[in-house]
Amino acid sequence: MAYSTALSQGISILLYVHAYTEKNCLNYLSTKVISEQLNIPVPTTVKVIRNLNNAKLTVAKEGAKGGILLAQPLSEITMLDVFLAVEPGKDLFKIHTDVTLQGQDVDDVKEKVIHHLEGAEIAMQNYLKDIRLTDLFHEEKKG
């Protein structure tokens, strides 16, 4: 798979910001604190937060008392929202199609591989869109 750990980091950041702001009455949370508490390197934290801000999942405030807050309730944010924020425009599968073999059979196989892998990506996105971040607190364990 071609994705980074940014999805899980983005989810962790949003959950941490939610928990912190619920407990501390909407105080902005600094990137440094988020980085330290979640053990994510500062440059990575900055990049993920920038992507979350660009997707309007968080709002940022500059300055000494700055940091980030959620831009909307956690119950309105899906895992797909976070995925699209932190992995913008990336395909799930990188497909090798530059082969020496040629012919209709080869082209048909390539098309089928691409079709099925694109279907798998769509299925994953459909699955993620049904999971709200608040569901992560209340999910039943499946055996």
What spans do the regions from the language model cover?
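Conserved segment of winged-helix/HTH DNA-binding domains
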Residues: 74-98
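A short alpha-helical element within helix-turn-helix/winged-helix DNA-binding domains
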Residues: 28-39
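Minor-groove-contacting beta-hairpin "wing" of winged helix-turn-helix DNA-binding domains
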Residues: 64-71
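C-terminal regulatory/oligomerization modules of transcriptional regulators
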Residues: 95-143
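Alpha-helical residues within the helix-turn-helix
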Residues: 36, 53-54
